[in-house]
Amino acid sequence: MGERKGVNKWYPPDFDPAKHGSINGYYKTHPLRERARKLSQGILIIRFEMPYNIWCDGCKNHIGMGVRYNAEKKKVGNYYTTPIYRFRMKCHLCVNYIEMQTDPATCDYVIVSGAQRKEERWDMAENEQILTTERNEKEKLETDAMYKLDHGGKDKEKLRAAIPSLNELQEHQSGWKDDFQLNSALRRKFRTEKKVIAEEEEKDNAVRLRTGLSIPLVPEREEDKKLASLLTFQSPDSYEDKKQWKRQEISSRSWFNSPSSAAGGAAGSLLQKLGQQGRGAAVAKALSSSTSTLPILVRRKSESSKSETNNTMSTILPVDTHPAAKDTDATDLPSIVNNINVSINTDINSCTTDACKASSSSEEENSIDSCATGKSLVADYSDSDSGSEV
């Protein structure tokens, strides 16, 4: 109440500065209120934060660094002119009280009672930290001139060893001294990079629009340029070359249909794969791999038997067993087929003529029909009188 009224600059009518001194004296209150209830004993209640990890002696629980307590602060002594304060607080997990006090000589806190410290200290010299001067050493420096002179020489050696680090720190600090110049350089760099980014984005959008891509493009790198220079995206044969090759294939093709369609199909697929090279070898391989090449049916008339079952017979003559097909090249396929057809027709004519002379006159018409049909490479089954089977 006194604080609020004092802040609001309100003073009662009977307030006398000489008598009361302040508004708190008028209301007989302290500005710290409940925290100053033991001020007459020299104790002030403060918020104390645990400086390191400890274990409570009462409940044996761990209390972490940074936990805050309402502690009683009291002055218990001096280290030279520096006061030593003691803090007394109650554990929040049990009824045990913990007492700690400051140690100005080591710049640390010391546990007086009620807890044990978790040892996590390290050597300050190994960590290259600033070492505090011991009390005995301070006394020697103040009383012993020779010791002070020797200590001054050691200090100069330390300074000489630390000069490079100090110069580096000063140079680094001087580089950030002019804030306006640094800000101008940063904004200038940002404007330049912004223009470059805008140009790259415009180029990427043009490429995406031209190619119809909807995915973002990654930035171009030197490795990508080298890899792209090594690749070639072009057809091995131009349109004119393909057209000329097609015309050569058509001009070299046979005018007559080949009787062996199966063998011709296999040979044609090989010719398309191999092209103009090895054409003769491919045809020879296709002909040798086929088991039924150029079958020829020949219809003959029997001399002795006149029965319907033994009226005719069929003979299959492969091309590769014919005498005309020997000692020839596979590339002369059309001429081979023509020679074989001529020789076969001659044999058929002679055979059918002898059969016609030996048969009876009642079968002359059939023999004439057989002679007429024998000249063809395909058997004629249109004769209804003959019941021959092929």
From Swiss-Prot:
Pfam families, sorted: Saf4_Yju2
Database matches in InterPro entries: Saf4/Yju2
Entry GO terms, CC: post-mRNA release spliceosomal complex; U2-type spliceosomal complex
Tagged with keyword Transcription: no
Major location (coarse): nucleus
Known role: May be involved in mRNA splicing.
Descriptive protein name: Probable splicing factor YJU2B
